Structure formats: structure tokens, C-alpha cells
Amino acid sequence: MWLGVDVGSTSTNLVLIGENQEVLDYCYIRTSGNPARAVEEGLEVLKPTMDMAGTAILQTAVTGSGRYLIAKKLGTDQVLDEITAQARAASFLNPDADTVFEIGGQDSKYISVKHGQVVDFEMNKVCAAGTGSFIEEQAGRLGIPLPEIGPMALRAKHPVELGERCTVLMESKIVSELAAGAGKEDLCAGLCRSIVRNYLNRVVVNKKVGQVVCLQGGIIHNEGIVSAFYEMLGDRLRITPYYDVTGAYGAALEA
């Protein structure tokens, strides 16, 4: 068995793969400011699968913002950057992939891939308005449980136009639209569309978007976001299997 670990600021993900690079088990854990504890919790979740397999972990690789800290704790020198890990998983799971869109809790990435190799990439600079944490904050502002944002967005009749704005301006616009009587479903739809526009206009910008675009990251749990991406990309869009743990899967493949 091989283990991949992706330690991010929002979530910590672990993936176990077998000799044919198939996923044996995986888990998605909230980091909650304590990556070491999150990894320990993840290993406990995977322990029954490891015990059942009856074989040891041959190698572990770590990626994510906390990769050096956790690699040291796990006693491995297999460390890789997040761009490489995300591209590796996308290319393995979608061999025709030429573009990867990955949106996480605190950052978002654009990756251009050719024959499985990274040829270009970009990450969000400062604005958080194209990331998962922003949606979570606005869900709290609207008084809506986070899992309900997507379904409510899909029920919208007249999505509110929030435009492409930075975090502060978008928050102000949401408050003013609420005060003006906008429905929460329409606001949810506007929020999802605006997140996608912010990502495309502030991260991708003028970068090449190919014909097979793999969408990855925990934000895909939000159906409203996925729908907004489909509106803009059509049948070029692919939802990568294991989309919320692709960083850890890519690390496992490199282990």
C-alpha cells in the first residue's frame, strides 16, 4: 500500500492506494488549525482498511501547505507541491485532461497539462472571493447551512447579479440586496455564479483553457458552483473522481 496526505488550511485528506494504483480507502478531515491532529485522526479512520489488507504502507508522500511539518512527523522525505499533486491525479483519472481547475478552502489553482506534464499554472493572489472559505462565510451571513447553498441556488428563479468583485465589495452587495428584499435562493445562485466568474477572471484570466477541463476540490460539493461552471464551459467540463481528495491521491501516486 501507498499513502498520500494532503495537508491544507481547511481540510486534511488521506488516500490509500494499492499495487494497481486503485483507491483502497480515503478520508476528508477538517484541519481546524491543527494539522498534526487531523493526520492522526485520518490514520485512525484508515486503520481498519490497513489492518484488513495485512500489508504495511510501503511509502508515504505529502503535499499541501503543511507538507514539510507533516512529512517530518511521518518520517518521509517524499514531499511534492500542490500543483504537481493535483495535475498527477487529474492526468491519471482523466488521461485526456489538458486543463485543471482546483478550488479549495483558501486558495484556487489553474493548471495547464500536456501529456500528463504541467506546462503552466496560476494561483489566486490575494482575493478570497473565488474560494470555498468565502462561500462558508456568506452562508453564515445569510443564515443558511453550508450544504443548502447549492440546492437553493438551483431553485433560483431570478439570480441576483453580484458581478466580479473583491471579497469586501461582494459582501457589501449581498447585504444591500438582502435589505432590498432579494430572495435567499436568488442570492445563493448569484453567489455561486460570482464565485465562478471571480475564479475565471482573476485566476485563469487569459490562460489557455483546453477541451478537457477537470474540476477538482471540495467546492464541488456545492451543486450551484458545478452548475455555474457547466453554464460557462459546457461539455468540456469533467468532474474528476475523488474530486475532494485529488491532492492526496496525486501524492499517493507519486509515493
Q: What residue ranges belong to the model's regions?
A:
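Short glycine-rich, Thr/Ser-proximal phosphate-binding strand/loop in the N-terminal lobe
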Residues: 2-37, 41-44, 121, 125
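Short beta-strand-loop/turn "lid" adjacent to the catalytic site in phosphate-handling enzymes
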Residues: 27-31, 50-83, 112, 119-120
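Glycine-rich phosphate-binding loop plus the immediately following alpha-helix
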Residues: 34-35, 115-158, 253
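Phosphate/pyrophosphate-binding loops at sites that engage ATP/ADP/AMP, CoA/4′-phosphopantetheine
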Residues: 42-58, 199-211
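Glycine-rich phosphate-binding loops at beta-strand->alpha-helix junctions
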Residues: 66, 203-229, 243-247
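Conserved phosphate-binding/catalytic loops in two-lobed NTP-binding clefts
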Residues: 77-83, 230-249
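Glycine-rich phosphate-binding/hydrolytic loop that grips phosphoryl groups
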Residues: 88, 132-136, 227, 240-255
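Adenine-nucleotide phosphate-binding core of ATP-dependent small-molecule kinases
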Residues: 170-203, 244
